[in-house]
């Protein structure tokens, strides 16, 4: 990791000038407003950046445990490639109760909201801010909260970008971590093990220590312990991959699942991908990246975000990204040797029901008569063979 990571700047980004093709363009300054919004389950702190655009959703972010919206997302939103997106969309950052900068400790006996209740705070936030719909961007615990929100209120969510999503209830290791985290000195280590893989802890000392210091010094430890306990007490999302004629619980909106190839959440994300509608879901696995793609690989994440938004029908005039060019080229030459280096680089065939084991996993399958779903034996009625395969991208 470069030395810059030791001095991460968590200040709010307000881009004014950008150089595009040698021409300096003045951008509209962000109007940033902070609000403490009272909901049925308590007060939540939000930061609005920009003015909501007509007929466009607002990007709503939700951070992971041990973080707040600044330490979680500012590295991404301050990145130059994101400026084109934030010119088209305003952003609403949500801080989980008591996790914002300078938050006071909750009184003794305070019952911290459950993960379901944290999700149910969001409709009140959206209504009080006068928003119509959102495009969710969540990481870890925040990804879970946004997914629960989208399942309960599908009309409010146009799309989701979910990083390190774990759709399952806690396992026994999580249960043990919850008990141990009751010891104040053990809490930062438990959070670090959630955010970073073992390889990152050993090889990326500067980044890990930067966030360890932030967790210890800048986040209210009592409040953090309550948030961690709430996350480790989460219920299973109980989502299932839909098939024709079924009435399963699943996301109705497009979803982009993102995970680093060495992230501690990689297995959970692949599992989540296998449970979602493959016609609306894309799995992006980032190489040379662990649990913090928004910090370590902001260019790739911004690129993927832009492509996702374009796929939803927004920003049609935006420049084509490398990911889009890669996918377009792959689709145009699906019968060529390029299939071997397409979005199937994840090598997760043994871990995801959506994988066929072939190099070519494109939903088109136009060049493979032997593998095409239209050419399967009439005796094969298994729904798994008739279900479209989810798209995967590796970068």
Swiss-Prot record:
Residues 326-339 have a biased composition (Low complexity). It comes from the Eukaryota. Belongs to the NDRG family. The keyword Repeat applies. Keywords: Developmental protein, Repeat. May be involved in pronephros development, after specification of the pronephros. The lineage of its organism: Eukaryota, Metazoa, Chordata, Craniata, Vertebrata. This is Protein NDRG1. Residues 339-378 are annotated as: 4 X 10 AA tandem repeats of G-[NS]-R-S-R-[AS]-H-T-[DGN]-[DES]. It comes from Xenopus tropicalis. Sequence repeats lie at residues 339-348, 349-358, 359-368, 369-378. Disulfide bonds: none annotated. GO terms for biological process: pronephros development. Residues 325-395 are annotated as: Disordered. Residues 377-389 have a biased composition (Polar residues). It holds the Pfam family Ndr. Residues 345-376 have a biased composition (Basic and acidic residues). The keyword Repeat applies.
């Amino acid at each position: 990791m470069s030395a810059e990571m030791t001095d991460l700047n968590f200040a709010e980004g307000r881009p004014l000038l950008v150089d595009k093709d040698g021409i300096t363009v003045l951008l509209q300054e962000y109007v940033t407003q902070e609000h403490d919004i009272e909901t049925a389950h308590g007060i939540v702190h939000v930061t609005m950046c920009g003015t909501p655009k007509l007929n466009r959703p607002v990007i709503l972010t939700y951070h992971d445990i041990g973080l707040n919206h600044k330490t979680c997302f500012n590295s991404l939103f301050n990145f130059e490639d994101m400026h084109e997106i934030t010119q088209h969309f305003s952003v609403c950052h949500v801080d989980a109760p008591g996790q914002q900068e300078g938050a006071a400790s909750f009184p003794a006996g305070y019952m911290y909201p459950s993960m379901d209740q944290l999700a149910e705070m969001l409709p009140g936030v959206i209504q009080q801010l006068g928003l119509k719909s959102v495009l969710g961007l969540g990481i870890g615990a925040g990804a879970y909260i946004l997914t629960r929100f989208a399942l309960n209120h599908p009309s409010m969510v146009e799309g989701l970008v979910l990083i390190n999503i774990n759709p399952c209830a806690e396992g026994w290791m999580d249960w043990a971590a919850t008990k141990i985290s009751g010891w104040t000195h053990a809490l930062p280590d438990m959070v670090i093990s959630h955010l970073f893989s073992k390889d990152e802890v050993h090889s990326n000392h500067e980044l890990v220590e930067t966030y360890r210091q932030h967790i210890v010094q800048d986040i209210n430890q009592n409040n953090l312990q309550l948030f961690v306990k709430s996350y480790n007490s989460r219920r299973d999302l109980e989502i299932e991959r839909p098939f024709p004629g079924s009435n399963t619980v699943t996301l109705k909106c497009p979803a982009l699942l993102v995970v680093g190839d060495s992230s501690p959440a990689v297995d959970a994300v692949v599992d989540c991908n296998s449970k979602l509608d493959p016609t609306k879901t894309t799995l992006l696995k980032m190489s040379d990246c662990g649990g913090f793609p928004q910090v370590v690989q902001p260019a790739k994440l911004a690129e993927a975000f832009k492509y996702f938004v374009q796929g939803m029908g927004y920003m049609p005039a935006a420049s084509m990204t490398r990911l889009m060019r890669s996918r377009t080229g792959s689709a145009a030459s699906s019968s060529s040797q390029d299939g071997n280096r397409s979005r199937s680089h994840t090598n997760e065939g043994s871990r995801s029901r959506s994988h066929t084991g072939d190099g070519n996993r494109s939903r088109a399958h136009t060049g493979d008569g032997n593998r095409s779903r239209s050419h399967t034996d009439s005796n094969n009625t298994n729904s798994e063979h008739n279900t479209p395969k989810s798209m995967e991208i590796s970068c």
